[in-house]
Amino acid sequence: MSAPGSLGDFCRYALDYEEGRYADDPVRLGGLFREYAGINRTPNIKRTVDLVRSLGIKIEAVPYLDTGGTNMMARGSWHIHYAAKDRPATQKFDIFHELFEVIHKNLNSFNPDCNLVREPYLSRYADRFAAATLIPPSFFLNQVGVTGCDMVKLGEDLELSHQCLLIAVGQHFVDIPFIGVLYEYRPDGAISENKKIEDFVATVVVKTGRARRIKELCGLQTVPARNSHPQIGSLVCAAVTGGRPVLWRSTHIEDSPAILVRPLLSVGREPYRVILLAVPNEESGMISSQVERIEPIPANGDVSCPSEKRCQNSDGCIWKVVGGYDEH
């Protein structure tokens, strides 16, 4: 990774490159910045901070933020603050998220024709830029193939957040109908010993272009909207209740995808996050090595819920207690 020029130099470069056509596209802009800065593989946190400083931006890990980051202009200089408490994987993503916002504002100041994007789109654009910058395509595609699209292993090996990785998969596998969802445990009230399925929230929903219109993956699992809760009796519900990964494969339902639902467990063996991946059956090889490694419970709609004995949500459950596929 080489040291780039100043922030202004990059903005002028982005506006001149192919007549500025990349300036309004966060993924292409991220790729352009990656090439400009010479990022050939995912940088560690030190290199990330050094890169931002080399642009003339003052960057600092601060204790006043519980998580995330922020940016501001003060005394003629841009500043980026990020939470000192966060893990490096999260910090890197947040830093590049904030960097996009700084670049975006500067592009507008250089060229008012570059319209400023407002929330909630600004945050989504910034996330896409961060993922595109942090993950060089050829390097990432090789890593995805080796791990079987394992977000956990990729996160550990590349020091990247699961959010960043899911977004990157969606950006790099545009030719297949891929869907990825990240659920987080976010209870409204006091944290209870028995976690309820309605306390999980879909914080990240990634769809490639060919999956945009898909609303239901199978009779037991819909594609959630962002900030929605899992259904009682869904594949996510079964994975959370049982604390084990679940793999849906059906041979008698046409065009049924392979759906891998993986709960991540805390030290106390309680689910705190769930990762859902859905790929076409004919593309299931892209998750096969992960499946072999984590050994999920198979499900195909012909049997009762694998977590039935631990279920506390039998009322309104969409999974037939006696087994069988409940077609909606």
Describe each region flagged by the PLM.
Residues 1-328:
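Active-site hotspot residues in diverse enzymes, especially metal/ion-binding acidic/histidine motifs
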